[in-house]
A protein has these predicted regions:
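Residues that scaffold the ATP/ADP-binding catalytic core of kinase and kinase-like folds
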Residues: 68, 146, 218-221, 302, ...
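Short, charged/small-residue-rich alpha-helical element at the C-terminal edge
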Residues: 227-299, 306, 314
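Generic structural signal for isolated residues within well-ordered alpha-helices
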Residues: 71, 97, 115, 217, ...
Length: 314
């Protein structure tokens, strides 16, 4: 379990992270979502012991990141946003080098190498130079490097950014598989990259946590009113003017007319559905309905509403 309490980081007068608190349970895959510069990387660097907080606590079970940095780092596999690979090395040489730093040698290294090659799908490139591998494979190599010591926790900073759609699907599938056995905390600035992968989403904006929950919980907590777009023919102006009096559950928003087609927009509450009443009113007033399309808030809308331009220092 990871417990973050009142965590802050200042760069001079700039508050990159502002007293954030959250918990992550073992076995969870949690997405950390925010615009560029919102504070994601700063938070991850503090959690992995590479950046000292200005204030607050980060605890891994009974260990504190300040007092027990090296012990915690033994339990963490960290993939930074800029994947630190030695391009001139072969894949197995790079993994052997990193394993050696962690004092994993001999038979233990062979077992660890075999495990990460299998888990990360590297069998076809293990003897290739890293420079000759595609970006998707380089991300897999970075994941293998983060996992060579079989950590309980994976912290991944934008692991699928810059990959093509097929590579994104592959890496997401790999992360989901790894999440069955490990705690995974991964950041992104693109909702679609993590939505189908994680159990829970936290949204950070300008250094503050502005949302935290499952997709369903976020939809329930932040979903706004429904916008209904209607296209009709033959609607007399006075019948449009009177519609709100006849169907009080809707709010008239706008009217545009083009080539005898009226485009009318209404708004109503998420717990209401006035479409039958609107249809009945249209029939009574001899409208021809061409289209009736509701637009409900989705996670992308919620993300856009909750995030604004952040400070680039974060």
């Amino acid at each position: 379990m990871i417990k973050v309490t009142d965590l802050s980081k200042n760069y001079g007068t700039v508050e990159a992270v502002k007293s954030i608190s959250f918990n992550i349970q073992d076995g969870e895959i949690v997405g950390f979502l925010g615009a560029n510069g919102a504070g994601k990387t700063t938070t991850l660097k503090m959690m992995t012991g590479y950046l000292v907080p200005t204030s607050g606590k980060i605890e891994f079970n009974d260990l504190n990141i300040i007092d027990d940095t090296h012990e915690i780092q033994k339990q963490i596999g960290y993939l930074p946003e800029l994947n630190p690979l030695y391009m001139e090395m072969r894949v197995y040489e790079y993994l052997e080098f990193l394993a050696g730093i962690r004092k994993i040698k001999g038979r233990k290294f062979k077992e660890a190498l075999s495990r990460v090659i299998e888990e990360c799908g590297l069998r076809g490139v293990v003897h290739k130079n890293i420079a000759d591998c595609s970006k998707g494979y380089r991300q897999r190599i970075g994941l293998a490097a983060a996992m060579i010591h079989d950590p309980k926790i994976l912290i991944l900073d934008e692991p699928v950014t810059g990959l093509d759609p097929n590579q994104i699907v592959e890496i997401r599938g790999l992360i989901k598989q790894l999440g069955k056995e490990k705690l995974v905390f991964m950041s992104s600035h693109i909702l679609q990259e993590i939505q189908g992968t994680v159990d829970r989403i936290m949204i950070i904006n300008q250094g503050e946590i502005v949302a935290n929950g499952t997709s369903d919980e976020l939809m329930s907590n932040f979903m706004g009113n429904v916008i209904l777009n209607m296209e009709v023919k033959g609607a007399a102006p006075e019948t449009i003017e009177h519609i709100q009096a006849k169907v009080p559950s809707v709010k008239f928003v706008s009217l545009n007319t083009s080539n005898d087609i009226q485009q009318i927009q209404f708004e109503y509450g998420k717990d209401q559905d006035p479409r039958e009443d609107l249809f009945r009113y249209a029939v009574e007033n001899h409208w021809t309905i061409l289209k009736m399309t509701p637009h409900t808030t989705n996670l992308e809308d919620i993300f856009r509403d909750l995030t604004t331009e952040s400070d680039t220092h974060a």
